[in-house]
């Protein structure tokens, strides 16, 4: 049981890094409703990081044949588009930046950052490992990382100004490049 808890925590921290980075970038563009947005982002990212391992475990290997041909290209495009928009907006004087307030953007980002969690669930199914406890741990860690990512991004933006929005955009583009290298090339 201790091994499962420890390995689940390590996996959870690894999976939560993308959610944290996206939340940090989104928090950089926030002007108000900071705590509400942090909670909402935490719920979205936490839920999908929790649900995807369960889904992966439930459907097992066949889903990889559906996702492999195009899924990661969509994820890469999403990160490039949103990151590029943040960078563009920081130079064009657009104060909006990336909005974590809209549920559509949050939904897309939460799904995009939880693809790896789906693969974790599939892996658990292949080795016959129970998935509920790891999924709960993964979801809670993702909630916490996302919540604090929004707060940290907002705080840093008040110190660094639009440089933080540029950094946030660069972070999202780098996540896209990471997906491109790991899954598409």
Swiss-Prot record:
Pfam families with a match to the protein in the record: Mntp
The entry's keywords: Cell membrane, Ion transport, Manganese, Membrane, Transmembrane, Transmembrane helix, Transport
Transmembrane portions of the chain: 4-24, 43-63, 67-87, 107-127, 131-151, 165-185
Main location: membrane
Presence of the UniProt keyword Protein transport in the record: no
One example GO MF annotation: manganese ion transmembrane transporter activity
Annotated Gene Ontology cellular component terms: plasma membrane
Entry's localization field: Cell membrane
Membrane association type: Multi-pass membrane protein
Family: Belongs to the MntP (TC 9.B.29) family.
Biological function: Probably functions as a manganese efflux pump.
Name used for this protein in its record: Putative manganese efflux pump MntP
